[in-house]
A protein has these predicted regions:
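Gly/Ser-rich phosphate-binding catalytic loop and adjacent alpha/beta segment
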Residues: 3-176
Length: 176
């Protein structure tokens, strides 16, 4: 499917989401912007997702956060560690709290225990929580040093799981 078709698909698929529709209608006629947002899917790299905030397959938004989280949930369930849970932290960037909450809700809906911090926490606190609680993984919503229009979804896992999760998500996410 080309980027124009994907753009149209999002307009139809999210017709009841006013925020998404308003943003997407706001770029109507701007071929370069539509292409940039929809020519590819945001890729899961070594530590997770990172991208410019906005609507589209190549942007950081709740839909891509849910998609990545479903991939993580499927992996943890396949490993039999869903009851160990996932600790979730977030920083002060735009929508970090929203993405963290969506991560927790998506994990819970998939049957994976989720521990969501109730306020901002730095990455070292997340890594401590993962070990202290015996979690299978941790997620921190942050884009670290990137400009303010970016956000990210970073995974924290034990080394034994990290490579196989990354490999699985790179294969699986296009189908989710």
């Amino acid at each position: 499917m080309g980027y124009k078709e994907e753009y149209q698909r999002w307009l139809e698929m999210f017709a009841n989401d006013a925020e998404t529709i308003n943003e997407l209608k706001g770029i109507a006629g701007d071929e370069k912007e539509i292409e940039d947002r929809f020519y590819t899917e945001l890729a899961f790299g070594t530590a997770g997702l990172r991208g410019v905030l906005g609507m589209g397959t190549n942007r950081m938004n709740v839909y891509n956060v849910r998609r990545a989280t479903m991939g993580v949930a499927k992996y943890l369930i396949a490993q039999g560690v869903q009851d160990q849970g996932v600790a979730i932290a977030y920083d002060s960037r735009i929508k970090s709290d929203v993405f963290a909450r969506e991560t927790a809700l998506t994990l819970a809906a998939a049957g994976v225990k989720a521990y969501l911090f109730d306020a901002l926490r730095p990455v070292p606190v997340l890594s401590y929580a993962v070990r202290h609680l015996g979690c299978a993984a941790g997620v921190v919503i942050t884009a670290s040093h990137n400009p303010p229009q970016y956000n990210g979804y970073k995974m924290w896992m034990l080394r034994s799981y990290r490579r196989s999760l990354q490999s699985l998500l790179q294969r699986q996410l296009p189908g989710l």
